[in-house]
Amino acid sequence: MESYIQNLFAERIGGKSFGKEDVIYKFEKIKRAKQAAKLKYPDMELIDMGVGEPDEMADESVVEVLCEEAKKHVNRGYSDNGVQALKDEIPIYLEKIFGVKDLDPVNEVVHSIGSKPALAYITSVFINPGDVTLMTVPGYPVTATHTKWYGGSVETLPLLEKNNFLPELDAISKEVRENAKILYLNYPNNPTGAQATKKFYKEAVDFAFENDLIVIQDAAYAALTYGDKPLSFLSVKDAKEVGVEIHSFSKAYNMTGWRLAFVAGNELIVRGFAAVKDNYDSGQFIPIQKAGIHCLRHPEITEKTRAKYERRLSKMVKILKEAGFNAKMPGGTFYLYVKAPIGTKDGAKFANAEEFSQFMIKEKLISTVPWDDAGNFVRMAACFEAFKDGEISIEEEDRILNEVKRRLTEVEFVFE
């Protein structure tokens, strides 16, 4: 007999149908395809270029700070909305790395237990039933999900190659603008790897003023850029009047499991975020925040990681070009975003990127992530594991990439 509890689930997560859906989502399909490929080719190495998680641990010096701070009696308790020492360090870091000036460490900065809850909480601060969030696609879905949970709707802004993967703000209709409260941006962008420009950020600021909305710029990959200097939305004139930027320690400092991020920018938005956060959590463990302070004081940790990804991405671009793909170095992140082929010379057909991605896993044992939201593309990550004797090894890195090249060049892909 079915439990009465089945009838109590909120509509936002499916109501009475919660847990009964038979839809198989993208990442579950990838997981199943990987399992099937391993069974079919048990002696063949599966090369995972789909996962978007750093391959290395946090720097040894960061771990040491955590250990030392964890031994201190004073650090045992709640931190609520964060230790002031971390808040004091954040503006110094943002000015040194990104040129952001005049950020108030008391009223314009708050830490978060990772960027995911930050995106969720800020959405709850502003969205009422009927409100609209402007959301770039493809992209990280948290803001869109929570907008819908609060009775709002999402207007998608496609990121197209012809526009350098920047949204066309001028194309948004007057009707949508009138109900919009949030413009969500993410640069450097996951999955496209695109970097925004100062010109675009200024357009976003002007757009926010003209339409009475806020900008949430998700800067999870902000410190991982190639070519140009890292760019912050908050470094643009008047940006602080309309929005906030969310920075994460996960990608820049190999601290995904540590769950530490911060929100910086407009005082009112930060205050609203802090009020909601205060009702959800009691702050990140103080020793983790102290380790975060050490990170911000040592940007050379990030530089070492950034250089590794740049080296790998450069090699991946060369390999993909040799296999027929139109691959280019990204502006930032650790991803390559390449157009999927429509088939192979020997007769295989791919209706979309998902079908190509499944082919790659099942036949070549190379895992990628497909995106069919705005064109047919696959994302390939440079954070694959390449260790030898417990250390990152360029020799092992080259072995893996040479194997990727061998498998890709065995096939003649057909492109539009």
UniProtKB/Swiss-Prot annotation:
Query: Quick one: which residues bind substrate?
Result: Y25, G52, K116, Y140, N190
* PTM-bearing positions, type N6-(pyridoxal phosphate)lysine: K251
Q: Which cofactor does it need?
A: pyridoxal 5'-phosphate
Its GO CC terms? cytoplasm
Q: In which pathway does it act?
A: Amino-acid biosynthesis; L-lysine biosynthesis via DAP pathway; LL-2,6-diaminopimelate from (S)-tetrahydrodipicolinate (aminotransferase route): step 1/1
Write down the top EC class of this protein.
transferase
PROSITE patterns given for it?
AA_TRANSFER_CLASS_1
GO process terms (BP): lysine biosynthetic process via diaminopimelate, diaminopimelate-aminotransferase pathway
Q: Where in the cell is it found?
A: Cytoplasm
Q: Which reaction does it catalyse?
A: (2S,6S)-2,6-diaminopimelate + 2-oxoglutarate = (S)-2,3,4,5-tetrahydrodipicolinate + L-glutamate + H2O + H(+)
As recorded in UniProt, its EC number(s) are 2.6.1.83
Q: Name one GO molecular function term.
A: L,L-diaminopimelate aminotransferase activity
The record's statement on gene disruption is: Cells lacking this gene are unable to grow in the absence of exogenous L-lysine.
Q: What is this protein called?
A: LL-diaminopimelate aminotransferase
State the species of origin: Methanococcus maripaludis (strain DSM 14266 / JCM 13030 / NBRC 101832 / S2 / LL)
The beginning of the lineage is: Archaea, Methanobacteriati, Methanobacteriota, Methanomada group, Methanococci
